[in-house]
């Protein structure tokens, strides 16, 4: 154990004499000694330098230094027992989990258990003291110390529900470590100087007359005395610490300066964004007409130019601070007051839930990201600033940050809605005009062609974007991944893209709508790819060109004149599609020969594409299939239900409204018949022979006599005709 005096270093052997003399009320010198509270408290670390060194080593990137810091904390734990600070213990547990995860050797299940135990202990330890005497919700206690609700929800899932995914555990670990670093470890370094001042003021109040002399004595005892080595192991350990003291102090200073610099730059970035908003809304109030204000925004004022220049400087120093400020509520994520001022009606894309038409928690799967874009007035509001900051590095970092935030957000709400919209908007805006832009939907293409958020698109690192999207899975990941594939073009083969989409859809449990091919019709009966109907729809496009001819031949054989006339009409409707396909092929060949006219030809094709009407509508095809199924079941006890049932909510083998009674699916009216009363078939009238079953039992059918040579080869019972007749008389068929 060591004696720690505020922020000063630890005392040596003679310094410990002062401790014991103060403990027993004795005085080493002739002067009156200081009380115990004036000197400090007994701690587990040797000196302030060791504490600072462990602080730096815990949060560095070197695994060896992190293990050394964990070993020092283990020593502290053995010295102090249960008196080790809770923040230190929680930090050590989380760092140890992180090291085991990075170094490998453990499976996913083991890592989830380790992360889960560390996170549960963290939440329990910070709330244990306040929940002993009064029942206070954990979320209320967490909000008091700036811990988000999703950490408490993660702890609840780890304790009471299904174990969350390993990525959620990692995300929680990284957040808690960052919270501990900012809230506890950095504050210990900031408060060291203040503790020294308080200790000196306390000494001045006790000994006013001999202030200078006592101060010199204490300084001499602290600085000149050194701990005496007791054994070789301890001396080696002290040498290692002494060598790392100077290096640790420098790293601590640089780390604290970096943290303070990030905070200052973040506050400065927020101030600049607020100034920008004030200037933009001033223009809106001046014109009091949104179209005129938008025209004025296109010509930035000198104040906006000044804000943009300063914000570029802050971005060069610390880009992360600017991104943090941009994604705060009130900036790229608007408030309801800002939307009302811009005459924008808030919609989160989940109209089904908002209108009360459905309460299924999976209704977000019905959201089509092809129609999700930032409202034009709001994007034009931020266009001057985003256009000025637009670069490959900044836009790439902004997109990756928004993708990483989506899993932690909810399904509905203004924040997830606008982060999702900005993500799609930036991807579409940075797609170069050409074959890639042709793949977007009509709404996205219109937004891309009608006005441009940026003067020119940046060459983003699309494979890295794919990794970011897959690394932060959420309900919208399959559709976002599809949009990224459209933007990157032929960066990945189509087969690889389809595999990634299927894996992502299965992982996020959103495989119902996400795997429908572009330009193809969805299955009208349950949109799952694992039914016979989906197999029929997947095979239909390949044979659609021959479908009309096959139908015509069948109808000619039947001699139906009316059906032939209807088929001729359908063939006339199909012909324009074939002509359009040939024209598109000719246009593609001309594009390869002349690349200068590529954009105009693609725009023409994008405008013509949505108006093709050659394919049969899903409603008519659905009615035709239902008619076929009803005809096949006509006369039976089963019928095709016309109700819209969500079969994905029912287990396999269960029906809507079915109870636990096994006899519920039995038919009300049915006839029974004995086995001997069933109709006699011609096969039964044929002369029977001796047959041997798979168990080696030979039986006689008809006369009941078997040859001795065949029966002698097998062992077992011989069933006689009378015994078989007795068995048949007791069986009933229904």
UniProtKB/Swiss-Prot annotation:
Places the protein is found: Nucleus, Nucleolus; Nucleus, Nucleoplasm; Cytoplasm
Compositional bias ranges of the Acidic residues kind: 578-605
Record note on what altering residue 269 to G does: In WTS; uncertain significance
Region of interest (Interaction with NOL9), ranges: 636-655
Compositional bias of kind Polar residues: 547-561
Known function: Required for the synthesis of the 60S ribosomal subunit and maturation of the 28S rRNA. Functions as a component of the Five Friends of Methylated CHTOP (5FMC) complex; the 5FMC complex is recruited to ZNF148 by methylated CHTOP, leading to desumoylation of ZNF148 and subsequent transactivation of ZNF148 target genes. Required for the efficient pre-rRNA processing at both ends of internal transcribed spacer 2 (ITS2).
Record-given protein name: Ribosomal biogenesis protein LAS1L
């Amino acid at each position: 154990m060591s004696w720690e005096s505020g922020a000063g270093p630890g005392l040596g052997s003679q310094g410990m004499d002062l401790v014991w003399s103060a403990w027993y009320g004795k005085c080493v010198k002739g002067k009156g000694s200081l009380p115990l509270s004036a000197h400090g408290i007994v701690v587990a670390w040797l000196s302030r330098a060791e504490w600072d060194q462990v602080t730096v080593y815990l949060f560095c990137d070197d695994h060896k230094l992190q293990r050394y810091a964990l070993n020092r904390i283990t020593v502290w734990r053995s010295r102090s027992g249960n008196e080790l600070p809770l923040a230190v213990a929680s930090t050590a547990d989380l760092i140890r989990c992180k090291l085991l995860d990075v170094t490998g050797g453990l499976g996913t299940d083991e890592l989830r258990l380790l992360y889960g135990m560390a996170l549960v202990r963290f939440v329990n330890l910070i709330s244990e003291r306040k929940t002993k005497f009064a029942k206070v919700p954990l979320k209320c206690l967490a909000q008091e110390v700036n811990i988000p609700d999703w950490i408490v929800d993660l702890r609840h899932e780890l304790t009471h529900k299904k174990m969350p995914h390993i990525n959620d555990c990692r995300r929680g670990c990284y957040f808690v470590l960052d919270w501990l670093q900012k809230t506890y470890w950095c504050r210990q370094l900031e408060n060291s100087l203040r503790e020294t001042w308080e200790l000196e003021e306390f000494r001045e109040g006790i000994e006013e007359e001999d202030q200078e002399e006592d101060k010199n004595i204490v300084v001499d005892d602290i600085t000149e005395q050194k701990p005496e080595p007791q054994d070789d192991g301890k001396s080696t350990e002290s040498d290692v610490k002494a060598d790392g003291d100077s290096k640790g102090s420098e790293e601590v200073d640089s780390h604290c300066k970096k943290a303070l610099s990030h905070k200052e730059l973040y506050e400065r970035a927020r101030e600049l964004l607020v100034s920008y908003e004030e200037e933009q809304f001033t223009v809106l109030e001046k014109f009091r007409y949104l179209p005129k204000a938008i025209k004025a925004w296109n010509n930035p004022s000198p104040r906006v130019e000044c804000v943009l220049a300063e914000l570029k400087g802050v971005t060069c120093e610390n880009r992360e601070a600017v991104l943090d400020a941009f994604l705060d509520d009130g900036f790229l994520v608007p408030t309801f007051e800002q939307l009302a001022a811009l005459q924008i009606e808030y919609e989160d894309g989940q109209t089904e839930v908002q209108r009360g038409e459905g309460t299924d928690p999976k209704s977000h799967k019905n959201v089509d990201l092809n129609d999700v874009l930032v409202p034009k007035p709001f994007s034009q509001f931020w266009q001057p600033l985003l256009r000025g900051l637009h670069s490959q590095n900044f836009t790439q970092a902004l997109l990756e940050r928004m993708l990483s935030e989506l899993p932690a957000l909810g399904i509905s709400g203004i924040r997830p809605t606008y982060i999702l919209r900005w993500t799609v908007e930036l991807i579409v805006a940075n797609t170069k005009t050409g074959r890639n832009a042709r793949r977007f939907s009509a709404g996205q293409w219109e937004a891309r062609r009608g006005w441009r958020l940026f003067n020119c698109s940046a060459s983003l690192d699309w494979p890295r974007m794919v990794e970011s999207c897959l690394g932060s899975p959420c309900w919208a990941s399959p559709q976002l991944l599809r949009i990224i594939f459209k933007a990157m073009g032929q960066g990945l083969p189509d087969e690889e893209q389809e595999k990634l989409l299927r894996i992502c859809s299965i992982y996020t449990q959103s495989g119902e709508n996400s795997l429908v091919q572009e330009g193809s019709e969805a299955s009208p009966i349950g949109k799952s790819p694992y039914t016979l109907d989906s197999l029929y729809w997947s095979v239909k496009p390949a044979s659609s060109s021959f479908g009309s001819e096959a139908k015509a031949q069948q109808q000619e054989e039947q001699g139906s004149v009316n059906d032939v006339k209807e088929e001729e009409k359908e063939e006339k409707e199909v012909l324009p599609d074939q002509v359009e396909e040939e024209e598109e092929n000719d246009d593609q060949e001309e594009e390869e020969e002349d690349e200068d006219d590529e954009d105009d030809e693609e725009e023409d094709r994008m405008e013509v594409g949505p108006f093709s009407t050659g394919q049969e509508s899903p409603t008519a095809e659905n009615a035709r299939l239902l008619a076929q199924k009803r005809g096949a079941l006509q006369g039976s006890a089963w019928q095709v239900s016309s109700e819209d049932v969500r079969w994905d909510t029912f287990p396999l083998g269960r029906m809507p409204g079915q109870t636990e009674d096994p006899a519920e699916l039995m038919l009300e009216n049915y006839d029974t018949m004995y086995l001997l009363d069933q109709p006699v078939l011609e096969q039964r009238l044929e002369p029977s022979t001796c047959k041997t079953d798979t168990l080696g039992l030979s039986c006689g059918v008809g006369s009941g006599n078997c040859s001795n040579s065949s029966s002698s080869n097998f062992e077992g019972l011989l069933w006689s005709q009378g015994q078989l007749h007795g068995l048949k008389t007791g069986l009933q068929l229904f």
